């Protein structure tokens, strides 16, 4: 071993308190033991008074001038056993050790740093049978919890932060393992000249773990100087003294996609590039690729720090371009994809059935007499009778026209399509067989309410189970909630959402017709009385007002009949369809399931209930994939092919008259062949 080649020195210190045993001279050692992997440092533990140990200088150099100095010198590495750190060094010993400090008094003098000299250690420490001696303080006086807590919370002793200069060729050594075994030069006063440690860490070196576990000191206030490697020294230094700060407000400069991301500038404080990465074993295989027998290797995705910051900017720009592209596409609104027999105008605000526009004639019959009244009757009545009559007539005309527009051009309560899609018909189903859909009677749980059960039906066109009181209109080709009837004068269905407007329209039209008759007759009679003329001369003077009297009387009859009829239906709690269908059954089997048992309550329920929202929202922007609507715009939809679903609401072109033989195909072909032969 290296310990046998070194010069002979004093092997053991003076034993004062019989703490350290006596060891034979080094020359007596003939056989050297193997290198010790764990350096025993329990002999470095000092006493509380600093005088319980040896006071004889070790090695006899300049240390003889300072008898109180115990282990403050660095000696050659041959006087200590080879560890995993010192065994790697091939440096020769110095002729004379250099003292770190000239004086050390008090309790500080009783501590021997782990970076200090090993020349005072017994020669038997290099043998295989060496057992480190324990002081009485370390063995019989264990550390209490308060001392342990104080030791953990205390700062590093000055011996750890003491700067030093490595002279000679030892000054270029950067290894954590070999730094402790090098020669330390003269002490300097500034911390700025401290050499940075190597790239090793506390958890990646085997010797570091041994030194941390074997060099614990039980004495309060003292710390083993080499229990922790030099890689943590920058962590123990004050932050302000070294001006260490982190800049978090830096922006990344824009780079081209082909430029690789820049790596941070390497400094002496940087970790190595392979930090915490698997090492290679003897066979050259990394730990991540080694064979694991009986285990399962889990796959993991790449970590986010590997993604350069520019990729996030590119992704955000890509999303913006996609959003702009979608906006440019302009998918349109819901009414453009509606599949019903409905026509829309003004961006989906007005809708009407795609049939003969009889509602235009109805509106004309309302607006035309109002215009004639304001031209030929209102000025004279304003000045000769009262201004209240024209104002009241204008208010009634406004209510009538407004309710007409709402009832004719609003959504009556169209139910959404494709809510309960029916499976497609199988090929083996017979087209002449019984229907697969029919009226279904939903039975209630209690037998006492059997009379109030109502049937519901599945609509094959709209592909949904219709709720009670809902029906499919064959003209609108829509299922309407609480449908009353399809009004040809409005060219729209009357359902739950526009029934109140319909009743207001017919009732206001009735009142407006009566008011028109009364105002025009009053104008003629007042003029006759003012001028004392006959009724014929007055009619000859106001011919247009007299014509409006007849027009008002004619237009009064039909709206008045509709008003009385719907007042009767509302009092019964029935719709027009329910009332007409009930006459198919005898009176003993007619039931009104939705009546409130009071005609006032029935009126209140119909006229004062809130208007439900629309199920479609035709003015809303279209979302691609909405199952209620089609996949193409109405004018871009392909032609409907003939199928087993029927021919409802499809335009069928008239068939041309066929000439020639209309028999079977075989006979037709044979007939054509014979005709060709005859012609030949």
Swiss-Prot record:
Upper lineage: Eukaryota, Fungi, Dikarya, Ascomycota, Pezizomycotina
UniProt protein name: Palmitoyltransferase erf2
Residue ranges of the region described as Disordered: 1-128, 246-315, 656-680
Similarity comment: family membership: Belongs to the DHHC palmitoyltransferase family. ERF2/ZDHHC9 subfamily.
Biased composition (Polar residues): 9-21, 63-89, 667-680
DHHC domain: residues covered: 457-507
Localization per record: Endoplasmic reticulum membrane
Class of the enzyme per the UniProt entry, highest EC level: transferase
Reactions catalysed according to its record: L-cysteinyl-[protein] + hexadecanoyl-CoA = S-hexadecanoyl-L-cysteinyl-[protein] + CoA
Source species: Neurospora crassa (strain ATCC 24698 / 74-OR23-1A / CBS 708.71 / DSM 1257 / FGSC 987)
Transmembrane segments annotated in the record for this chain: 362-382, 385-405, 502-522, 544-564
Pfam families to which the protein is assigned, alphabetical: DHHC
């Amino acid at each position: 071993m290296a310990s046998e080649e070194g010069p002979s020195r004093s092997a053991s210190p003076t034993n004062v308190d019989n703490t350290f045993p006596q060891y034979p001279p080094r020359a007596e050692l003939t056989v050297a033991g193997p290198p010790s992997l764990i350096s025993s440092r329990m002999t470095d533990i000092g006493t509380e008074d600093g005088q319980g140990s040896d006071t004889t200088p070790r090695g006899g150099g300049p240390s003889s001038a300072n008898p109180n100095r115990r282990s403050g010198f660095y000696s050659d590495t041959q006087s200590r056993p080879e560890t995993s750190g010192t065994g790697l060094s091939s440096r020769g010993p110095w002729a004379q050790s250099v003292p770190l400090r000239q004086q050390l008094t008090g309790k500080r003098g009783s501590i021997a740093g782990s970076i200090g000299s090993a020349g005072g250690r017994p020669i038997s420490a290099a043998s295989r049978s060496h057992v480190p001696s324990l002081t009485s303080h370390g063995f019989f006086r264990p550390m209490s919890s308060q001392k342990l807590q104080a030791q953990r919370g205390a700062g590093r002793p000055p011996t750890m932060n003491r700067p030093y200069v490595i002279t000679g060729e030892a000054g270029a050594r950067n290894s954590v393992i070999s730094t402790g075994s090098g020669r330390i030069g003269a002490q300097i006063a500034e911390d700025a000249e401290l050499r940075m440690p190597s790239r090793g860490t506390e958890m990646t070196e085997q010797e570091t773990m041994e030194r941390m576990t074997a060099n614990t000191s039980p004495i309060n206030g003292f710390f083993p100087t080499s229990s922790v490697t030099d890689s943590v020294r920058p962590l123990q230094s004050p932050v302000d003294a070294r001006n260490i700060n982190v800049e978090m407000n830096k922006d990344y400069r824009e780079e081209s996609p082909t430029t690789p991301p820049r790596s941070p500038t390497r400094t002496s404080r940087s970790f190595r590039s392979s930090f915490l990465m698997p090492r290679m074993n003897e066979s050259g295989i990394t730990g991540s690729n080694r064979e694991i027998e009986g285990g399962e290797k889990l796959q993991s995705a790449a970590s986010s720090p590997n993604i350069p910051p520019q990729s996030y900017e590119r992704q955000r720009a890509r999303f913006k371009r996609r959003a702009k592209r979608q906006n440019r596409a302009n998918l349109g609104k819901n009414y453009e994809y509606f599949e019903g027999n409905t026509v829309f105008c003004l961006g989906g605000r007005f809708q009407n059935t795609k049939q003969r526009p009889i509602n235009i004639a109805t509106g004309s019959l309302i607006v035309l007499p109002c215009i004639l009244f304001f031209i030929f009757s209102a000025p004279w009545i304003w000045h000769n009778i009262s201004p209240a009559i024209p104002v009241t007539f204008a208010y009634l005309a406004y209510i009538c026209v407004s309710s007409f527009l709402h009832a004719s051009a609003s959504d009556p309560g169209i139910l959404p399509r494709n809510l309960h899609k029916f499976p497609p018909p199988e090929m083996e189903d017979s087209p002449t067989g019984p229907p697969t859909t029919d009226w279904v009677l939903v039975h209630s749980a209690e037998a006492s309410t059997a009379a109030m059960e109502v049937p519901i039906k599945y609509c094959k066109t709209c592909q949904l189970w219709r709720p009670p009181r809902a029906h499919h209109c064959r003209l609108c080709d829509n299922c309407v909630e609480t449908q009353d009837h399809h009004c040809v004068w409005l060219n729209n269905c009357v359902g739950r959402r526009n029934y109140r407007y319909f009743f207001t329209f017919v009732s206001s039209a009735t009142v407006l017709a009566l008011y028109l008759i009364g105002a025009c007759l009053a104008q003629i009679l007042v003029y006759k009385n003012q001028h004392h003329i006959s009724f014929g001369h007055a009619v000859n003077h106001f011919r247009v007002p007299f014509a409006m009297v007849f027009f008002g009387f004619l237009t009064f009859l039909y709206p008045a009949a509709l008003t009385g009829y719907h007042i009767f239906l509302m009092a019964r709690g029935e719709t027009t369809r329910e009332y007409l269908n009930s006459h198919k059954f005898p009176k003993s089997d007619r039931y009104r399931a939705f009546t409130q048992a009071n005609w006032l309550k029935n009126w209140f329920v119909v006229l004062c209930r809130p208007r439900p929202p629309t199920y479609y929202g035709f003015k809303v922007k279209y979302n691609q994939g909405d199952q209620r609507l089609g996949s193409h715009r109405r004018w871009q939809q392909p032609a409907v092919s003939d199928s087993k679903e029927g021919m409802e609401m499809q335009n069928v072109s008239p068939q041309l008259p066929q000439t020639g033989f209309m028999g079977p195909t075989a006979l037709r072909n044979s007939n054509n062949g014979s005709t060709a032969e005859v012609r030949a």
